[in-house]
Amino acid sequence: MKTYSAKPSEIEKKWWVIDAKNVVLGRLASRVAIMLRGKHKPSFTPHLDCGDNIIIINAEHIKLTGKKLNPKDGKVYYRHTGFPGGIKDTTAGKILSGKYPERVIKMAVKRMITRNVLGAKQMSNLYVYANCEHPHMAQQPTIYDFASENPKNKK
């Protein structure tokens, strides 16, 4: 039997909506990364964008386990300005309580996707919103109940 390789015209993309309220960040991010790549489909082809479109709502209510929200020794995100000595840091707690809490989910998923042109295309299929409203009702997304999939997914 020959190995099956999907063609771009054969790929069917679905729209999913996931409620992130009281869901553990790492578990959600790993599942979303799998769905964005299309690895949950039997027709997965590594060099094509065969993943689905994912809408995540209630990103401001995401949960982190352990001491990651602790301001002193919690999860730290680093970035660099490009100038000598230009390393900047911020904590997960500051981001979640700030203006754009959806960035925590976007960063977690982005770091689980391949770092190339295909990964950038797959990340463009992810839509994260801080509250429960989203402008994608015309696509008729299917509700994906991630929290009830495993008791460890919810905190």
From Swiss-Prot:
Highest taxon in the source lineage: Bacteria
SUPFAM superfamilies: Ribosomal protein L13 (SSF52161)
Gene Ontology BP annotations: negative regulation of translation; translation
PROSITE patterns according to UniProt: RIBOSOMAL_L13 (PS00783)
Keywords assigned: Ribonucleoprotein, Ribosomal protein
GO cellular component term of the entry, any: cytosolic large ribosomal subunit
GO MF annotation: an example: mRNA binding
Subunit and partners: Part of the 50S ribosomal subunit.
Protein family per UniProt: Belongs to the universal ribosomal protein uL13 family.
PANTHER family linked to this entry: LARGE RIBOSOMAL SUBUNIT PROTEIN UL13M, RIBOSOMAL PROTEIN L13
Function, as annotated: This protein is one of the early assembly proteins of the 50S ribosomal subunit, although it is not seen to bind rRNA by itself. It is important during the early stages of 50S assembly.
Protein name stated in the entry: Large ribosomal subunit protein uL13
